[in-house]
């Protein structure tokens, strides 16, 4: 918002802020001085009023205390009943005290004006009597409300002494009505009031009777003021009050203070009026200064306004660069006007040069456009022919790639056949080796079977021996049995053994016969196996011969396939070289075509730039023509 203000308005705003700040500081400083002055005057006034009122209270109480002392001194000299009655009835005492009385050491009580006392009343037990005797001199009681008159009273008492002995205590009841009137007469021009307070904070006399006998902490619960010299502040019913305490000196047995309470708002009311007056005066002064300053700024800014109108005429009017400002002073505005004239003169020369350059630029742009159009046509023709060559080379490359692909397929199939022939040859060779090994193993088996047949013959011979031994054993066992039978009972055990031996021999003979039968069968099988092995060996040799002939044929086929594969690889290699050459030509043609396209695009960009240049040249010519040079 400040940026949109005029320069004169900014100056006026800044000046108003300075003036306002100056008046504000002056008002605050004056307010500070006035506050201090009012506070000092108020403190001096309260101190003086407190001292005067305290002195008046002291004098008022002192005169009455003096009457009590004089009465005690008179009674000390003569305390006969007649003297006591006459003395207590003196007008000076009856007009001053509500009651004057004497309590004697023997319990006799005399009071004037006379008033009936309760039965058994003993003055020696009363506080005023005890306090006076204990103090040994003049005493004052705390204020209390009289039961008969409902007035606030105090008692002044002093002992009656003769020859160092206490004869009794004389006292007088004082109404505080006069003292209340003295204190209540202080209204401080309606700003406050005074009240009497004891040293322990109990209020003794107060304009508001409801506050009497209350403590300061009860009246001011939030921030209770301390009873001391000086000034303090406290809140009462939502208002701040200034409190000052002045001690009442010369009072026996009691400590009393005169408290002065002032409403702070009323005490500083003059300061509030001064603030209002100062603010009003400051506002009036500021308005007057701003009006005068506005007129002065308007007068001083006149040359600047003329310069602004001239610049607006150049910027928004006919653009007359032949106009100059009239410089009539050598101040800042004169220097600014002279600089403006120099600037316009320089712009004038520059615009004339720009006008000539704009015409030349238009002609040059026309020549560039014509040349670019011609180059564009040639580039189109070159692009068409390049595309034709590229298409032919692409067809040649496709044919070469087809030949190379077919040659590669043939070479691949020949390689597969060669590999398969090699595999077959290896299989045949493995078969020949296996059949040779089989023939050798058959021959070995025939030899083993022949050896086995020979050993079975040997086993038959051994079995014949075993059979002979079994027969002999059987005969021996039979003979042994016969001999045992002859021996009778003595040969029974031997007969059993012989019989068992004969059984074993018989069983051995049967087993030998079975083995003989099995060996004969084994010999028959061995002879048949030898015949079969011999026939298998003959067939195996024939198979080996046939496999050798098949291996030789496969070797011949493998050599022929290898030759065909070599030819196919040569054709594929030549075709791949031809394809690489075709691809290289194709890439070159493509690069040429790309470069040609880029050239066409550059020519088109040049044409667009030339068109834009021609447009800008026309615009520049229009702008130059808008100035009057």
UniProtKB/Swiss-Prot annotation:
Disruption phenotype: Mutant is defective in taxis toward 17 amino acids, including Gly, L-Ser, L-Thr and L-Val. Mutant also shows decreased chemotactic responses to TCE, chloroform and methylthiocyanate. Deletion of pctA, pctB and pctC abolishes chemotaxis to 5 mM histamine, but significant chemotaxis is observed at a concentration range between 500 nM and 500 uM. The pctABC-tlpQ deletion mutant is devoid of histamine chemotaxis over the entire concentration range (50 nM to 50 mM). Deletion of the gene significantly reduces chemotaxis to AI-2. Residues 1-10, 298-629 are cytoplasmic. Coiled coil: none annotated. Residues 410-424 have a biased composition (Basic and acidic residues). Residues 36-259 form the Cache domain. GO terms for molecular function: amino acid binding; transmembrane signaling receptor activity. It is found in: Cell inner membrane. L-isoleucine binds at residues 121, 126-128, 144-147, 173. The chain crosses the membrane at residues 11-31, 277-297. L-methionine binds at residues 121, 126-128, 144-147, 173. Keywords: Cell inner membrane, Cell membrane, Chemotaxis, Membrane, Methylation, Transducer, Transmembrane, Transmembrane helix. GO terms for cellular component: plasma membrane. Residues 298-352 form the HAMP domain. Changing residue 144 to A: Binds L-Trp, but not L-Ala, L-Arg, L-Thr and L-Pro. 100-fold reduction in AI-2 binding affinity. Its main location: membrane. L-tryptophan binds at residues 121, 126-128, 144-147, 173. Belongs to the methyl-accepting chemotaxis (MCP) protein family. Chemotactic-signal transducers respond to changes in the concentration of attractants and repellents in the environment, transduce a signal from the outside to the inside of the cell, and facilitate sensory adaptation through the variation of the level of methylation. Major receptor that responds to all naturally occurring L-amino acids, except L-Gln and L-Asp. Also involved in repellent responses to trichloroethylene (TCE), chloroform and methylthiocyanate. Also mediates chemotaxis to histamine, but does not bind histamine. PctA has a broad ligand range and responds to most of the proteinogenic amino acids, whereas PctB and PctC have a much narrower range and show strong ligand preference for L-glutamine and gamma-aminobutyrate, respectively. These receptors are paralogs: pctA gene duplication in the common ancestor of the genus Pseudomonas led to pctC, whereas pctB originated through another, independent pctA duplication. This is Methyl-accepting chemotaxis protein PctA. It comes from Pseudomonas aeruginosa (strain ATCC 15692 / DSM 22644 / CIP 104116 / JCM 14847 / LMG 12228 / 1C / PRS 101 / PAO1).
């Amino acid at each position: 918002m400040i940026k949109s203000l005029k320069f004169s308005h900014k100056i006026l705003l800044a000046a108003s802020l300075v003036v306002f700040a100056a008046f504000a500081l002056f008002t605050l400083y004056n307010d500070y001085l006035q506050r201090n002055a009012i506070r000092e005057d108020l403190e001096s006034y309260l101190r003086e009023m407190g001292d005067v009122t305290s002195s008046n209270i002291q004098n008022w109480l002192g005169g009455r205390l003096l009457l009590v002392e004089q009465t005690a001194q008179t009674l000390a000299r003569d305390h006969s009943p007649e003297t006591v009655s006459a003395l207590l009835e003196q007008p000076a005492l009856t007009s001053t005290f509500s009651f004057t009385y004497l309590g004697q050491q023997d319990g006799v009580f005399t009071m004037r004006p006379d008033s009936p006392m309760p039965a058994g009343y003993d003055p020696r037990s009363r506080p005023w009597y005890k306090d006076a005797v204990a103090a040994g001199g003049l005493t004052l009681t705390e204020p209390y409300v009289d039961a008969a008159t409902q007035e606030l009273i105090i008692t002044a008492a002093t002992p009656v002494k003769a020859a160092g002995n206490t004869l009794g205590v004389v006292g007088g009841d004082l109404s505080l009505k006069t003292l209340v009137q003295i204190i209540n007469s202080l209204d401080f021009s309606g700003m406050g009031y005074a009240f009497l307070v004891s040293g322990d904070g109990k209020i003794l006399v107060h304009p508001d009777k409801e506050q009497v006998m209350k403590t300061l902490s009860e009246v001011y619960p939030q921030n209770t003021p301390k009873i001391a010299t000086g000034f303090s502040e406290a809140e009462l019913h939502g208002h701040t009050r200034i409190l000052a305490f002045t001690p009442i000196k010369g009072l026996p047995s009691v400590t009393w203070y005169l408290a002065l309470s002032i409403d702070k708002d009323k005490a500083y009311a003059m300061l509030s009026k001064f603030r209002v007056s100062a603010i009003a005066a400051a506002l009036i002064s500021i308005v007057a200064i701003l009006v005068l300053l506005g007129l002065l700024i308007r007068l001083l800014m006149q040359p600047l306004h003329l310069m602004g109108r001239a610049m607006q005429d150049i910027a928004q009017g006919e653009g007359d660069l032949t106009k100059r400002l009239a410089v009539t002073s050598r101040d800042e505005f004169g220097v600014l006007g002279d600089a403006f004239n120099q600037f316009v003169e320089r712009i004038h020369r520059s615009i004339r040069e720009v006008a000539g350059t704009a015409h030349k630029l238009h002609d040059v742009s026309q020549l560039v456009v014509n040349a670019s159009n011609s180059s564009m046509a040639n580039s189109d023709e070159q692009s068409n022919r390049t595309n034709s060559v590229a298409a032919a080379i692409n067809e040649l490359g496709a044919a070469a790639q087809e030949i190379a692909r077919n040659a590669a397929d043939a070479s691949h199939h020949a390689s597969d056949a060669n590999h398969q022939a090699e595999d077959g040859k290896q299989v045949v060779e493995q078969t020949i080796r296996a059949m040779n090994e089989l023939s050798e193993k058959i021959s070995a088996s025939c030899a083993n079977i022949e050896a086995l047949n020979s050993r079975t013959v040997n086993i038959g011979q051994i079995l014949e021996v075993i059979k002979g031994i079994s027969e002999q054993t059987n005969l021996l066992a039979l003979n042994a049995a016969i001999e045992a039978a002859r021996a009778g009972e003595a040969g029974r055990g031997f007969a059993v053994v012989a019989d068992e031996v004969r059984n074993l021999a018989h069983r051995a003979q049967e087993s030998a016969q079975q083995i003989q039968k099995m060996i004969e069968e084994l010999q028959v099988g061995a002879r048949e196996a030898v015949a079969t092995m011999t026939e298998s060996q003959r067939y195996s040799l024939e198979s080996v011969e046939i496999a050798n002939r098949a291996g030789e044929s496969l070797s011949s086929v493998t050599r022929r396939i290898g030759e065909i594969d070599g030819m196919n690889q040569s054709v594929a290699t030549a075709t791949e070289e031809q394809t690489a050459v075709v691809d290289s030509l194709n890439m070159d043609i493509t690069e040429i075509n790309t470069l040609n396209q880029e050239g066409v695009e550059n020519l088109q960009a040049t044409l667009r730039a030339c068109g834009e240049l021609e447009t800008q040249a026309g615009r520049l010519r229009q702008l130059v023509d808008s100035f009057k040079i």
